């Protein structure tokens, strides 16, 4: 669903920022 896609995108962004 769209919700899963949005959550996945947010997770990827958060992960990237966390290990920036």
Swiss-Prot record:
It is an enzyme of class 1 (oxidoreductase). GO terms for biological process: tricarboxylic acid cycle. Catalyzes the reversible oxidation of malate to oxaloacetate. Keywords: NAD, Oxidoreductase, Tricarboxylic acid cycle. One of its GO terms (molecular function) is L-malate dehydrogenase (NAD+) activity. This is Malate dehydrogenase. Gene3D superfamilies: NAD(P)-binding Rossmann-like Domain. The gene is mdh. It catalyses: (S)-malate + NAD(+) = oxaloacetate + NADH + H(+). Belongs to the LDH/MDH superfamily. MDH type 2 family. Its EC number is 1.1.1.37.
């Amino acid at each position: 669903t769209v919700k899963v896609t949005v959550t996945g995108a947010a997770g990827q962004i958060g992960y990237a920022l966390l290990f920036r």
